[in-house]
Swiss-Prot record:
Organism: Escherichia coli (strain K12)
Pfam family, any one: NTP_transf_3
EC number(s) reported in the record: 2.7.7.76
Gene: mocA
Requisite cofactors: Mg(2+); Mn(2+)
Taxonomy of the source species: Bacteria, Pseudomonadati, Pseudomonadota, Gammaproteobacteria, Enterobacterales
Catalyzed reaction equations: Mo-molybdopterin + CTP + H(+) = Mo-molybdopterin cytosine dinucleotide + diphosphate
Annotated binding of Mg(2+), by residue: D101
Protein name in UniProt: Molybdenum cofactor cytidylyltransferase
Length: 192
């Protein structure tokens, strides 16, 4: 395990799913449980950003010493507000950024992206499609959240020092946004 923070955003409404996806069953827990567990195989601490149903997540994870919970009251204004809420809690020179609905990221993916670290941002792609986790230096992260007139984190990072890297693991682009996505992902990545 490396001394590195990982921001995991879990604040959204899951509106396309039709139900709250963070607590959908996955392996022996939930999608979010598995996303956190997988990140902690490589990272030393999770900065979990909550919003919608934040009290439930606080109750579930508050007693875990390697999870810092940040509530984003502005979560309805978009993902960028969640990252901005988390940044003051970052204590390491680099940090990963990912989402709570990415339960298939493995330690090997984190390790591979970590090995490419530099003073900017490492933006992983799979077949040209942007994915996660993103790795970013703390100075680069601070600059990104202060950029005016940006609507998302990737856009803010693209305006600074960044390196796009092709990764062969399709898991970095796995999106669980709809019921069909969930069924397909469970069939492909879990033992039912």
């Amino acid at each position: 395990m490396s001394a590195i923070d990982c921001i995991i955003t879990a604040a959204g409404l899951s509106s396309r799913m039709g139900q709250w996806k963070m607590m959908l069953p996955w392996e022996q827990g939930t999608i979010l449980d598995t996303s956190i567990k997988n990140a902690l195989q490589f990272c030393s601490r999770i900065i979990l950003v909550t919003g919608y149903r934040g009290n439930e997540l606080h109750e579930r994870y508050a007693n875990q010493s390697n999870i810092t919970i940040i509530h984003n009251p502005d979560y309805a204004q978009g993902l960028l507000t969640s990252v901005k809420a988390a940044v003051p809690a970052v204590q390491t020179e680099h940090c990963f950024l990912t989402h709570g609905d990415m339960p298939t990221l493995t330690i090997d993916i984190f390790r591979k992206i970590w090995s490419l670290r530099n003073d900017g941002a490492i933006l992983p792609l799979h077949n040209g499609i942007p994915g996660h986790p993103i790795l970013v230096s703390k100075p680069c992260l601070m600059q990104a959240i202060q950029r005016p007139n940006v609507t998302n984190m990737r856009q803010a990072l693209l305006m600074g020092d960044h390196y796009s890297v092709e990764i062969e693991n399709a898991e970095i682009i796995l999106d669980i946004d709809t019921p069909d996505d969930f069924i397909t992902a469970k069939e492909r990545y879990t033992e039912i």
